[in-house]
Amino acid sequence: EPNPRLETVIRGVELCRAHNIDLILAVGGGSSIDCAKVVAGSVHYDGNPWDIVLDSSLVKDALPLGVILTLSATGSEMDPMAVITNTEANLKYGVGHPDFIPKFSILDPTFTYSVPVSQTAAGTADMMSHTFESYFTLNDGAFLINRLAEGILQTCIHYGPIAVKEPENYEARAN
């Protein structure tokens, strides 16, 4: 589901507990991965997972998380952040914890071939927007980081349209 919901996190926690799960494998894009991160951090917490979204210091013993990426966009496969929506409270918050960093991520460009054109374009725009956030954050003296961001943006501008026109172009999907 887009914008992973607290209700889905709660169902995931219940499933993990009921079946004594010891590793979570998230398959999909950023929303699936974000949901899995908060599930992993909530399984050994007795309260509501929303508490962890509000205060990540409550994560004490997260389950390990692996990722198979099928939609490139957010970078969630390599970072400690997650965004969860609480529909009851009409809130959408981000949370970060070192234990949310996946233990492994499988990024096979062929797994993205079936992504619809509209989502490929939106994913490219999402990558660019996240890169712009970093680029325009006040980081005096961050010369190297800014050059990396510029390289990412140039790559998106070059390969994004190719991936849209040729969904099974390995080079475009890999870059």
Q: Language model features by range: what are they?
A:
Residues 22-24, 63, 103:
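Conserved acidic residues
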Residues 65-67, 71-90:
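A gly/ser-rich beta-alpha-beta helix-loop segment of oxidoreductase catalytic cores
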Residues 1-47, 57, 162-173:
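N-terminal small/polar loop signature for handling phosphorylated ligands or for N-terminal nucleophile
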Residues 81-174:
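Carboxylate- and glycine-rich phosphate/diphosphate-binding segment that chelates Mg2+/Mn2+
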Residues 46-70, 99:
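Short, acidic/small-residue loops that bind anionic groups at enzyme active sites
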Residues 36-39, 76-82, 117-118:
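Short acidic, glycine/serine/threonine-rich loops at helix termini
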